[in-house]
């Protein structure tokens, strides 16, 4: 265990549920986090902002929150701003890091300006001439492509497009989820990886090998045939360097304390960062518990470690 007296945390709210497209995942994460904290002796209580006003946190004497909300107002800076207003310490990034981290478009703009490698991309706005934009994008980026709403997590509405004819429909589908759509060149040849970040813990990279085309919502939260390779199979020196770049990708967005940075390798071993996640899933399929377990850190110890980061100035 961490050696922290659980009484130091005071009364803790585990925020989960919410109203985003990721509500069901958040409910699962939150229940497990709640149990993990209670197992460690923390005075933790469930709190679903979809069912109760946030003012109840202050009224009921909560001093700290473990944010297990995913997507929407739980991850885009809004809940963080409210918690700041009420003077409640919380896990994860603050307003700026959360807002940028959930916005794939602005994430990529920051990375381009700070030297973090990211796949070439184009943006499409809801209301654009999709057929014309599709033709232009294929000419610029080639195929295959990934189409993503700019501000959804858990691979909600992410589509892999292999033919030019399929692109307009994919754009239309993504535009129902967000007014900005990202179209990204698919990086092929080296596989998908994630770097889990939790304070000063040195967690291993995970190589993700989905049974399907890519690591989509089903592969993340439903399927049991996705492979998670720990160790990831890369040389130690390369893994260390990739973890350093991942931490930089996280830091330049203003993200703090804990999260994930996802990236692809091409056939030559070059990394291209896709996104960060400032409120990672904590289900039994999720990546941070897997990375922690690989270095001997159990679920309860991990959530206490994450919560302990709120004790820092």
Swiss-Prot record:
Mg(2+) 1 binds at residues 262, 275. Transmembrane segments: none annotated. SUPFAM superfamilies: Glutathione synthetase ATP-binding domain-like, PreATP-grasp domain. It is found in: Cytoplasm. Its cofactor is Mg(2+); Mn(2+). Its EC number is 6.3.2.4. Pathway: Cell wall biogenesis; peptidoglycan biosynthesis. It comes from Burkholderia cenocepacia (strain HI2424). This is D-alanine--D-alanine ligase. InterPro entries: ATP-grasp, ATP_grasp_subdomain_1, D-Ala_lig_Van_CS, D_ala_D_ala, Dala_Dala_lig_C, Dala_Dala_lig_N, PreATP-grasp_dom_sf. The gene is ddl. It catalyses: 2 D-alanine + ATP = D-alanyl-D-alanine + ADP + phosphate + H(+). It is an enzyme of class 6 (ligase). GO terms for molecular function: ATP binding; D-alanine-D-alanine ligase activity; metal ion binding. ATP binds at residues 138-193. Signal peptide: none annotated. GO terms for cellular component: cytosol.
């Amino acid at each position: 265990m961490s050696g922290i007296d659980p009484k130091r945390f005071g009364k803790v709210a585990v925020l989960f549920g919410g109203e985003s497209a990721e509500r069901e995942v958040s409910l699962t994460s939150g229940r497990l986090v709640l149990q993990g904290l209670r197992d460690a002796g923390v005075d933790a209580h469930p709190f679903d902002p979809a069912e109760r006003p946030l003012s109840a946190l202050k009224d009921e004497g909560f001093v700290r929150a473990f944010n297990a909300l995913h997507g929407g107002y739980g991850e885009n800076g809004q809940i963080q701003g409210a918690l700041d207003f009420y003077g409640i310490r919380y896990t994860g990034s603050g307003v700026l890091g959360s807002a940028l981290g959930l916005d794939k478009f602005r994430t990529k703009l920051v990375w381009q300006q700070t030297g973090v490698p990211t796949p070439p991309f184009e943006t499409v706005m809801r209301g654009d001439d999709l057929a014309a934009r599709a033709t232009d994008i294929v000419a610029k980026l080639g195929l295959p492509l990934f189409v993503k709403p700019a501000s959804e997590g858990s691979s909600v509405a992410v589509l892999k497009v292999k033919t030019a004819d399929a692109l307009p429909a994919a754009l239309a589908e993504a535009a129902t989820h967000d007014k900005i759509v990202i179209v990204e060149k698919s990086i092929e040849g080296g596989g998908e990886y994630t770097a889990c970040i939790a304070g000063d813990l040195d967690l291993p990279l995970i190589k993700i090998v989905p049974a399907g085309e890519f690591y989509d919502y089903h592969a993340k939260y439903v399927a049991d045939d996705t492979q998670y390779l720990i160790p990831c199979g890369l040389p130690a020196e390369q893994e260390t360097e990739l973890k350093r770049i991942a931490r930089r990708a996280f830091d330049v967005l203003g993200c703090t304390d804990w999260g994930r940075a996802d990236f692809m390798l091409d056939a030559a071993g070059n990394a291209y960062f896709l996104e960060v996640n400032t409120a990672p899933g904590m289900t039994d399929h999720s990546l941070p518990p897997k990375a922690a377990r690989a270095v001997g850190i159990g679920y309860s110890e991990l959530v206490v470690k994450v919560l302990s980061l709120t004790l820092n100035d």
